[in-house]
């Protein structure tokens, strides 16, 4: 999917159900609230909901989420 930003095209990336499950599992393993998890990732709670539930996000959000998942492993 595409999103326009100041006339520029941005390709959105899909958080798959498997990735969303991994995000939820890490949140649970660390005993974090959604607010705490979103703060650790560096995103808003609304954006975190998209990650947790699976959905399309901007590349920078995807990158932050994948970096967060890879931490501690």
Model regions: which residues?
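General nucleic-acid-binding
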Residues: 1
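A short, Lys/Arg-rich alpha-helix, primarily the initiator
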Residues: 4-29
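Amphipathic alpha-helical repeat elements characteristic of tetratricopeptide repeat
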Residues: 17-21, 42, 59
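Short alpha-helical DNA-recognition segment
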Residues: 31-49
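Short, basic-rich loop-to-helix N-cap that marks the start of a DNA-contacting helix
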Residues: 54-67
């Amino acid at each position: 999917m595409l999103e326009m930003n100041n006339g520029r095209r941005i390709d959105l990336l899909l958080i798959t159900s498997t990735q969303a499950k991994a995000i939820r599992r890490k949140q649970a393993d660390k005993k974090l609230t959604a607010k705490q998890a979103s703060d650790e990732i560096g995103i808003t709670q609304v954006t975190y909901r998209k990650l947790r539930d699976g959905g399309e996000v901007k590349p920078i959000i995807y990158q932050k989420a994948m970096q967060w998942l890879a931490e501690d492993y």
